[in-house]
């Protein structure tokens, strides 16, 4: 590995900032899957896209629209301290656990940033890259506060 790469958090190293587990044939996966548990993407923007696709599935398929609902599914108690994760995200984005999130960049960008920070201990991506990945995920989905 290149100098310093092995010291990066696993999710950043894998260009998978949401630490998405293997199992789905995501667009943008690297040809070599060097991690036995988590997906490795060729570009971080595609890992961000996958993270957002999951959040959109939570919203439109499972009707998860509060931080409590979203994080309880994202970080289940069988694998995480879900309540601590919810508290962290709520503090980061300044909402209450049961506040409903609008289906907009304004609401989901802070959520995505906080998930990345929680998963990796830091959030190294600029807003431009995050928004690009998020918009790639939103293709085909409605946007706006009325989309639920």
Residue ranges of predicted features:
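Cell-wall polysaccharide-cleaving catalytic domain and substrate-binding groove, primarily
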Residues: 1-148
């Amino acid at each position: 590995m290149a100098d310093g790469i092995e010291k990066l958090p696993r999710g950043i190293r894998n260009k998978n900032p949401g630490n998405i587990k293997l199992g789905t044939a995501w667009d943008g996966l690297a040809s070599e899957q060097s991690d036995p548990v988590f997906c490795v993407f060729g570009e971080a923007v595609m890992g961000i896209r996958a993270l957002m696709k999951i959040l959109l599935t939570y919203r439109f398929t499972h009707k998860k629209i509060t931080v409590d609902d979203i994080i309880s599914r994202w970080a289940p108690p069988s694998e995480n301290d879900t309540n601590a994760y919810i508290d962290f995200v709520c503090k980061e984005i300044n909402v209450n656990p049961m506040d409903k999130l609008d289906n907009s960049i304004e609401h989901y960008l802070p959520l995505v940033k906080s998930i990345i920070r929680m998963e990796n201990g830091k959030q190294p991506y600029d807003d431009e890259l995050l928004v690009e990945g998020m918009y790639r995920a939103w293709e085909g989905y409605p946007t706006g506060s009325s989309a639920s």
